[in-house]
Amino acid sequence: LESIGRVTVVAPATEQSGVGHSITYLTPLTCKQIYDGEIFRGWAVDGSPADCVKLGISELTPKPTDLIVSGINGGLNAGINVLYSGTVAAAIEGAFFRIPSIAVSLEEDPHADFEAAASIAVQLIQRILHHQGSAARLYNINIPTKATRDYRAGLAPEIHVLPMGVARYGDHYIKRQDPKGRNYYWSTNDPPPQPTEHPTDVMALANGHVTITPLHFDMTHQQQLSEMQSWSLALDSQSL
C-alpha cells in the first residue's frame, strides 16, 4: 500500500475472527506502539477490528484519512460470512466516516501467498480509487488460492464483480466431550455452499476467480418500508 500513499497500521493485538462489528465501550481501550528495532510499524489495539478503525481515525492516524484497507485476512469473507466478518466490519466502520473503505481477504491455505494477494489487491484498489465519484464507498475483495498461483505464473486472474451470496451454509457442528463429560461443539464449514441460479461471490471464488462486491451498511428494506408505512399499526389506547 505504500505505493499508493502514507500507511498507518492499526491492528488488533489478538485474534479476532468472527467477531463481526463488535466494539468496546464498557471497558477502556488500550493500545501500544509496535517497533521493529528503530522502525515504527504501527499500533496494536486490545480491541476488535471495528475498534481499530474507530480509534485509529479519531486518535491515532494523521488527518485527513483518505482510505481504509482492512486485511489481508487469512480466510475468505464471502456470502453470508460477510455478516460475521471482523475484516468486513472494519471496512464498514471506515465507511461510517464517509471514507472509501475496502476489505481484502485471501483463501485459507497452508501455503497462502500473501505477497501475490497484496499485489493483486493494490492494483484493484488503485482502479477502485480511480472511480471515487461512484456512489459506493465500501467494497469487499476476495482472492482465492488459484488466483495467486495464476498470478505467480504470469497469468492475470479473472476479476468478477458480483453480489454476495445469501444461501445458508456451514451450519453443522462437531459434538465432543471434555474429560469431565461436558459437551462442547466445534463449528464447521459443512455442508458447503451449493450452486445457485444466479452468479454470486461464493460461486465465482469456488471457480478460482477474484471477486469484488460493493456493499452498503444501510440495512433498511426500502421496498418493505414503503409497504409497511401503509399498514394500520396504531395501538389501542388502554392502560394495563
Regions found by a protein language model. Give the residues of each.
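A cross-family phosphate/adenosyl-ligand binding-site feature
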Residues: E2-E59, K63-P64
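Short beta-strand segments
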Residues: A11-P12, S70-N73, V104-S105, I141-P144, ...
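Short glycine-rich anion-binding loops that position phosphate/pyrophosphate groups of nucleotides
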Residues: E15, S48-P49, N73-L76, K146, ...
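Alpha-helix C-terminal capping segments
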Residues: G56-P62, A89-P100
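Short, Asp-centered acidic motifs that coordinate Mg2+ and/or phosphate
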Residues: L67
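Glycine/threonine-rich flexible loop motifs
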Residues: L76-S85
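Glycine-rich phosphate/pyrophosphate-binding loops
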Residues: A95-A117
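Electrostatically charged, flexible surface regions
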Residues: A116-L240
